[in-house]
């Protein structure tokens, strides 16, 4: 109790309770009050009655008596009784919670969606009504990555035109609470001019033009527009990275000199890819210069713009799209003295291209492309464009690694980015709030999705353990995938239309290769001679089908506009197997078919000067072809009774002829010797796996 004036006291607890809830304005009013401001009720009380002081809770006396309290200090009931009026002290934890903001509700819903996604993935796919045209576009065929407790703590920080993906737990929590720190963590730009000479992008740039280069290619706007149309016709249908309706205005604006560095990088990459798809004659007629010099000029411009735009320090969607079409590399040693990533395969399937694709993957991860855009509340359109770019990069990585016999464990297995929708570009726009459903017809994304679906399934099978019990499951995976692709995509293909025929042939070729891979694994598991022969025949048929469909892609005149890409997809693994089979079994029901496709592959590869350098693997294939031809000649000169049948009596003679031909090859001085000439008889087909695996351990100089 404190004395205010004569016979006027204020209960200390009540004042403290009011003070805890009082606003700054209330406290100011109290300071201005005098004793005259206090009103005494008719029943004079020794306690102060303050009319402005309204309590939120009933006093202790009224609460115990279960009567209504006026919640004034003192309350009317205590005044009538002459009792001391005490109010309970304020409990900070008893405050009414603040009103939940809309953004908080959105965050909670997003967190719930992520939790449900993780739960669904861990529990397996739910069984529901089947619809052949609807499929979960998440990477269900890839092995699920281990769930990290930090997965929910991630943020996409704006960084100028770029973004920065952060999933470190403590830092992401701070950034999520303090959005003002986004500017602090961004890439510093005020020191770019000072440090420009020390930036690491220079490592990626090859030598520019020759030292005596003085005639820079100057394109007219008509030539630029023609190159853009060539890109749309020859490149975009088979390399579906761009959303043409939104990119086209940027392309024409950049042609007129209005674009940023990122836009210029994309424009030069488009020029580069367009010229790559042209023949020597067509390039000279359009640009008035030979094709090689035009490509060197565009290469130099891309390298300069990539460094000026700091595409690795602050990658953007435009710059990554440009890099996905083209990546300069430090070594320029091949027929045409240059190569690049998507268009790289049109000149040389070099290991450096695969290595540089890893740089592109890291840049994509730095802006969170490996995480689906729904985690960051992006617009449906932005999330869909990111999916296209990410999966194009991943599929390229699979194919590039395969060129060099490298086991790809796959960045895709550590990603939850969904596959893009099966829609046309016209179905998407930045204004969309809800994405359309997949189309039950041919779309511009059909070829892209066909390739991606097969690549995902192949990675799943590739990483399963090799044992006999799994082979039936692998074959079932291939059969289910084939049925799904036929019912969803291939049934809408009209093979009279060039791009749809490309999709049909390339899909059939890849599925045959998938079957070849699965059957090939069974060669190591089968024990009996009959089982080995049966598996070898199935493997041979699949390899021939893959080669035949691949060669039709490269030789069909209707598909000439896409030959620049498919000429680089050399099915050397299948070719090596059929040559091995011809060495092991020079006779049989499929020999004529096998030799026809072998001769076609060698004629096209060796007699077309515009094709990329096949690399050192070609030396191995040439050696096996010579070996198979010698075996065929030996069989032709043998008596008919010795030319057929795998009986035990005839095997020693076959082995003797094989050894004789092997000795002749050893004397040629080609350096291969017994490495590529092991005992080749029907029972040695199981050694094919050992050869195909061990070839990567040796270095064959051209």
Swiss-Prot record:
Keyword terms, alphabetized: DNA-binding, Metal-binding, Nucleus, Transcription, Transcription regulation, Zinc
SMART domains, A to Z: Fungal_trans, GAL4
Predominant place of localization: nucleus
Pfam families, sorted: Fungal_trans (PF04082), Zn_clus (PF00172)
Cystine crosslinks: none
Subcellular location(s) of the protein: Nucleus
Region called Disordered, residue ranges: 629-679
Pathway(s) where this gene product acts: Secondary metabolite biosynthesis
PROSITE patterns to which the protein is assigned, alphabetical: ZN2_CY6_FUNGAL_1 (PS00463), ZN2_CY6_FUNGAL_2 (PS50048)
DNA-binding region: 59-85
Domain of life: Eukaryota
Key word Oxidoreductase present: no
BP term (GO), one: positive regulation of metabolic process
Basic and acidic residues bias: start-end ranges: 646-663
Disruption phenotype annotation: Abolishes the expression of all the 7 aspergillic acid biosynthesis cluster genes and reduces ferriaspergillin production.
Expression triggers: Expressed during the earliest stages of maize kernel infection.
Molecular function GO labels: DNA binding; DNA-binding transcription factor activity, RNA polymerase II-specific; zinc ion binding
Record-level GO cellular component terms: nucleus
InterPro entries assigned to the protein according to its UniProt record, in alphabetical order: Sec_Metabolite_Reg, Transcription_factor_dom_fun, Zn2-C6_fun-type_DNA-bd_sf, Zn2Cys6_DnaBD
Protein's job: Transcription factor involved in regulation of gene cluster that mediates the biosynthesis of aspergillic acid.
Protein name as annotated: C6 transcription factor asaR
Species of provenance: Aspergillus flavus (strain ATCC 200026 / FGSC A1120 / IAM 13836 / NRRL 3357 / JCM 12722 / SRRC 167)
């Amino acid at each position: 109790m404190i004395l205010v004036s004569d016979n006027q006291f204020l209960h200390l607890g009540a004042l403290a309770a009011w003070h805890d809830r009082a606003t700054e304005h209330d406290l100011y009013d109290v300071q201005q009050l005098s004793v005259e401001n206090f009103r005494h009720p008719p029943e004079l009380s020794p306690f102060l009655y303050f009319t402005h002081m309204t309590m939120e809770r009933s006093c202790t006396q009224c609460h115990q008596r279960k009567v209504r309290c006026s919640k004034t200090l003192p309350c009317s009931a205590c005044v009538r009784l002459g009792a001391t009026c005490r109010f309970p002290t304020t409990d900070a934890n008893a405050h009414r919670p603040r009103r939940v903001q809309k953004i908080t509700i959105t965050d909670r819903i997003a967190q719930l969606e992520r939790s449900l996604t993780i739960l669904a993935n861990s529990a397996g796919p739910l069984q529901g009504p089947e619809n052949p045209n609807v499929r979960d576009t998440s990477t269900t065929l890839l092995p699920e990555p281990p769930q990290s407790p930090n997965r929910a703590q991630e943020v996409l920080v704006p960084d100028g035109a770029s973004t920065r993906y952060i999933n470190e737990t403590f830092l992401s929590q701070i950034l999520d609470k303090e959005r003002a720190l986004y500017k602090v963590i961004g890439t510093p730009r005020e020191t770019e001019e000072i440090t420009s000479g020390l930036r690491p992008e220079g490592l990626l740039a090859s030598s520019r033009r020759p030292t005596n280069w003085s005639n820079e290619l100057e394109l007219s706007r008509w030539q630029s527009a023609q190159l853009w149309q060539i890109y749309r016709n020859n490149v975009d249908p088979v390399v579906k990275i761009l959303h043409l309706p939104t990119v086209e205005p940027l392309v024409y604006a950049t042609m007129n000199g209005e674009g940023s560095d990122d836009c210029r990088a994309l424009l030069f990459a488009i020029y580069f890819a367009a010229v790559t798809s042209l023949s020597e004659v067509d390039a000279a007629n359009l640009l008035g210069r030979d094709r090689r010099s035009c490509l060197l000029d565009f290469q130099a411009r891309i390298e300069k713009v990539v460094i000026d735009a700091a595409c690795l320090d602050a990658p953007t969607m435009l710059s990554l799209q440009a890099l996905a079409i083209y990546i300069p590399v430090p070594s320029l040693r091949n027929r045409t003295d240059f190569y690049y990533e998507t268009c790289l395969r049109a000149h040389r399937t070099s290991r450096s291209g695969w290595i540089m694709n890893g740089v592109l993957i890291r840049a994509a991860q730095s802006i969170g492309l490996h995480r689906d855009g729904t985690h960051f509340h992006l617009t449906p359109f932005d999330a869909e464009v990111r999916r296209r770019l990410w999966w194009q990069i991943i599929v390229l990585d699979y194919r590039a690694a395969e060129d060099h016999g490298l086991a790809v464990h796959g960045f895709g297995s550590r990603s939850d980015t969904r596959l893009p929708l099966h829609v046309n570009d016209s179905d998407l726009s930045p204004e969309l709030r809800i994405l359309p459903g997949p189309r039950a017809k041919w779309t511009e994304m059909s070829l892209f999705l066909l390739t991606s679906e097969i690549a995902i399934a192949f990675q799943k099978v590739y990483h399963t353990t090799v044992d006999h019990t799994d082979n039936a499951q692998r074959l079932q995976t291939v059969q289910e995938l084939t049925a799904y692709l036929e019912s969803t995509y291939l049934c809408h293909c009209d093979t009279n239309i060039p791009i749809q025929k490309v999709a049909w042939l390339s899909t059939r070729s890849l599925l045959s290769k998938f079957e070849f891979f699965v059957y090939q694994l069974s060669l190591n598991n089968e024990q009996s001679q009959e089982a080995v022969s049966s598996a070898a025949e199935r493997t041979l048929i699949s390899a021939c089908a893959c080669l035949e469909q691949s060669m039709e892609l490269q030789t069909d005149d209707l598909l000439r506009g896409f030959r620049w890409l498919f000429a680089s997809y050399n099915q050397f693994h299948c070719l090596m197997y059929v040559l091995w089979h011809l060495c092991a079994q020079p006779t049989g029901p499929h020999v004529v078919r096998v030799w026809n496709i072998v001769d076609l592959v060698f004629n096209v590869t060796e007699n077309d000067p515009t094709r990329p350098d096949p690399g050192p693997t070609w030396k191995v294939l040439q050696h096996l072809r010579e070996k198979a031809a010698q075996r065929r000649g030996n069989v032709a000169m043998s008596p008919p009774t010795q030319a057929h049948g795998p009986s035990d009596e005839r095997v020693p003679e076959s082995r003797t002829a094989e050894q004789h031909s092997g000795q002749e090859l050893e004397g040629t001085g080609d350096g291969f010797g017994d490495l590529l000439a092991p005992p080749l008889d029907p029972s040695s087909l199981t050694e094919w796996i050992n050869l195909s695996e061990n070839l990567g351990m040796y270095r064959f100089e051209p």
